[in-house]
Design a protein with these regions (language model features):
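Glycine-rich P-loop/Walker A and Walker A-like loops and their local beta1-loop-alpha1 context
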Residues: 1-54
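Accessory N-terminal region flanking or inserted into the helicase ATPase core
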Residues: 1-5, 13, 104-206, 213, ...
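Structural motif
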Residues: 6-10, 41-45, 204-212, 233-235
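Hydrophobic helix-cap positions at the C-terminus of alpha-helices
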Residues: 20-28, 57, 190-194, 220-224
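A general structural motif
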Residues: 32-36, 197-200, 225-227
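Conserved P-loop NTPase-based nucleic-acid remodeling module centered on helicase motor cores
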Residues: 33-144, 150-153
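Conserved helicase core region in the C-terminal RecA-like lobe
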Residues: 66-72, 201-210, 214, 229
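Conserved RecA-like helicase ATPase core segment
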Residues: 213-244
């Protein structure tokens, strides 16, 4: 079951959430109830969320509540299901790999020649590939975009350079490494195999938005766990309020 809770920015949503978590903790282990509760938050928010949990739950520790990021949950599930055989490459490793690729492909680039030593360009390319993958834009989708642009258009030439870099990057990691975005996709496809997930009640908080990959994870968790609860920030008077 999926439950959505939303409120205005000025409301104490953490207080509400931890009160609901407290109620669920009281039912841990009862027939039909979860055995544990996982609170999923953004990577950079895990420490603050733990502090908030100690404060709102008024306890020195908790056994049945675990606060973790989606990437950490992915690692747990893939370790359990045996889906993490390839070496994980993070954004820093991808930065180095992209720098190597851009230098090697310099003669084949039209617009971005000589950019292999530019940290800002490599960072931009790193972030762009990450976003393309998060939004399920693969090489074929990127090629379709390029085909819609007029010949000799500067934007088209830029896209063709990005396509070449993206293609070489995929070739370099294929079968050897797995990046964060593909790691998350692999996680989503293994959730149904996890005996860990089926006994967990999930709470999700602290996210401003969800990428398609994250939405797929939420769908799989909803189908295969004791339930998913999402806490959102929304102004009920906003033009988008009706989607909730």
């Amino acid at each position: 079951m999926l439950k959505l809770y939303y409120g205005r920015e000025n409301l104490d949503k953490d207080k509400f959430m931890f009160e609901e978590i407290r109620k669920s903790l009281a039912n841990i282990g009862r027939p039909g109830c979860a055995k544990r509760i996982f609170l999923l938050v953004p990577d950079q928010y895990t420490l603050q969320a733990e502090r908030n949990a100690f404060s709102y739950l008024n306890t020195a520790g908790f056994i049945d509540l675990e606060i973790l990021s989606i990437n950490r949950l992915a690692a747990k599930v893939l370790n359990e299901t045996g889906g993490s055989a390839r070496v994980h490459i993070d954004k820093h490793g991808r930065h180095m790999l992209l720098s190597k690729i851009v230098n090697e492909e310099d003669n084949n680039l039209e617009v971005f020649k000589g950019m292999g030593q530019s940290h800002s360009f490599i960072d931009m390319t790193n972030n762009l590939i990450s976003e393309l993958k998060q939004y399920n834009t693969d090489l074929s989708a990127l090629e379709s975009i390029i085909e819609t642009l007029e010949e000799d258009n500067l934007l088209k030439r830029k896209f063709k350079d990005i396509y070449r870099i993206y293609e070489k990057y995929d070739e370099e990691i294929s079968g050897k490494y797995i990046d964060t975005e593909d790691f998350v996709s692999l996680f989503a496809s293994n959730i149904a195999k996890s005996s860990l997930v089926e006994d967990i009640e999930f709470w999700i908080s602290g996210f401003d938005s969800f990428t398609p990959k994250t939405i797929e994870i939420i769908k799989e968790l909803t189908k295969n766990s004791k339930g998913v609860n999402i806490v959102l920030t929304s102004d009920e008077d906003s033009k988008d309020a009706e989607i909730f």
